[in-house]
Amino acid sequence: MYMRILLSCSELGLGHVSRIIPLGKRLAAHGHEMFFFSGGKAHEMLQKEFTNVYKCTPISWYENAHGIITSASLVNLFFPLPLFNMDKNRLEIKNSNAWETIHRYYDLRENIHDIAPDLLVADGDINALRLAQRWKIPSVYIANMIRPSYGFSAFLSPGERVVERYVKKCSKIIIPDNPPPYTISEYSIGNLDRLGLNAKVEYVGGFVDTTPVKGSQDHIFAPISGPPGTRGKLIKTLIPVLEKLKTKCVISLGTPGKKVSTKIGNCELHTWLSDEERQEAMRNAKFVIFSGGHATCFETIKYSKPSICIPTQPEQLGNAAKLQDLKCSITAKNKSQLQKAVVKLEKEQESYNRNMSALNEFSSKFKGLDRAVDIIETSLD
């Protein structure tokens, strides 16, 4: 049965769109007619890959050069705040999340009659689930965060309840992660039995192909990702530590566009790496330093690379904590902790390598993208 499928994804980081792109390509190859919604950088990336791509208002945390500011983000839920736009190098007023949410919903709704989807698939986009419920469109939710319990402000609990109300209306919930006890996003998903979601949830495995790939140990690889403020915070933490090491370091600054490269000490800095360049850098790394984003977690699993996580927001903090519990990673929050983590990881490299190999062996049993496609294609049966 061929369907008209609407896919909408959150643009908080690029992890959501990195899942939607291969999923959309696979579904399109199966003959389904695809329509895509997102905002910000995610919208730009979707436009490069597909034709039916619609722009909607992005929803974002309040962040500056120090990263995400929790207190300001709480205020910004309901009130606009001044914010320096680092991409455009000017002071602007950031609209409240309430304003962004309302406008995003109407952006989605504007084209719903013309698209007339048979199914709506949302990756981290609660507005799309709300639209599906209001317009009685069957829906599938893709998420690695449902009821976060690690580093998440208690003030946001009422918002979690609203989210859960829409999630419970889905036909199916796809978690692109390993089943327990090796679920990387365990601390961000929560107790599904208590939430009454167990019957709808399936852990399909990561969308990244985790078939083992052997490489060398030539350098330390630090792929930086996220919004400008997050990237700025990571750069300020990383470079002062890495430039003093004897080991070669490769740093990707996560800025899409024309590639520009330079050197600081023993560090190679690249504004952007192609998929092939990134894979090569990951494959030949001794270990990886990153923020703890879910997609990159599974890249480290694919190449069996131990890591150091420098989380900049609660979801990443939860992922980092789980990897640390599995003795596959070390969490660092500042330059001092990063320096100690590098020393510890180099000293105990063999032990961490063994743990990562065991995690890779378990993860490679699952083909998350294949299973997600099966679930979506049979969701209307």
Identify the role of each PLM range.
Residues C9-I21, G229-G232:
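A short, glycine/small-residue-rich beta-strand->loop->alpha-helix junction that serves as a flexible
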Residues E11, H30, M34-W99, E268-H270:
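Conserved nucleotide-sugar phosphate-binding/catalytic loop shared by glycosyltransferases and other
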Residues G24, E202-F287, C297, L317:
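Donor-nucleotide binding loops and adjacent catalytic segments primarily
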Residues L108, I112, A281-R283:
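Short alpha-helical donor nucleotide-sugar binding micro-motif in glycosyltransferases
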Residues L120-D123, E277-N319:
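A donor-sugar binding/catalytic signature common to diverse glycosyltransferases
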Residues W135-Y203:
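Active-site-proximal region of nucleotide-activated glycan assembly enzymes
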Residues I330-T331, K335-S336, K340-N360, D381:
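Conserved donor-nucleotide binding/catalytic region of nucleotide-linked donor-dependent transferases
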Residues E350, F362-D381:
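C-terminal alpha-helical cap of glycosyltransferases
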